[in-house]
A protein has these predicted regions:
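Short, mixed-charge low-complexity intrinsically disordered segments
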Residues: 37-164
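A short, exposed loop/beta-hairpin motif centered on an aromatic-Gly-Thr core
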Residues: 16-33
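A short beta-strand micro-motif
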Residues: 3-12
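Short glycine-rich, basic-tinged beta-strand/loop micro-motifs
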Residues: 14-16, 77
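Serine/threonine-rich, low-complexity intrinsically disordered segments
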Residues: 5, 29, 74-77
Length: 164
């Protein structure tokens, strides 16, 4: 008999939930280290994503689209707000209609939209992307028997795998 430690990735909700085996190890410590490292990367990515969502929400609350429409409505520019924020530097004459503070907000909004648009549909806190470890016994007949599974929070507290 041999113990096998699988680091798995889980994501999604309800019928969209899926798990993938990412790594297999023969030692608890190696699997634990990899699982915690990967979860740390997910946590950092989710934190970064939240920053960009919060930035968009803050700028939306400031109604920069309304301000844009009000100012450009007095001109004949004919460029919609979303076309403008896709690449504001391509429209220097429109950008020049606004003070430096507003220009910075438009550029920040464009950057935030770019980041948010690049986020995977399953890479958000609502789909709970997470890594965990599943422990199996590889039996003499070649079959595998599931022993237990541990999330990253539980793994941080564990120094070794304890068996009953």
């Amino acid at each position: 008999m041999k113990t096998l430690y699988m680091v798995k990735y889980g994501c999604g909700q309800w019928e969209d939930y899926h798990e993938d085996i990412e790594y297999m190890y023969e030692t608890f410590d190696d699997a634990k280290q990899k699982c915690l490292q990967l979860q740390s990367e997910v946590d950092q990515r989710l934190q970064d994503n939240k920053h960009w969502y919060d930035t968009l929400n803050k700028l939306d609350d400031e109604n920069i689209e309304g301000i844009y429409n009000e100012v450009t409505g007095r001109t004949s520019c004919g460029v919609s707000f979303y076309e403008f924020v896709d690449s504001p530097n391509d429209f220097p004459r429109i950008l020049g209609l606004f003070d430096d503070n507003m220009q910075e907000k438009f550029l920040l909004y464009a950057e935030a939209v770019e980041h948010v648009d690049s986020i995977s549909i399953f890479d958000n806190e609502y789909d709970n992307p997470h890594y965990f470890m599943s422990v199996y016994e590889w039996l003499d007949d070649g079959s595998m028997k599931w022993i237990d599974a541990f999330g990253s929070e539980k793994l941080q507290e564990m120094s070794c795998l304890e068996r009953n």
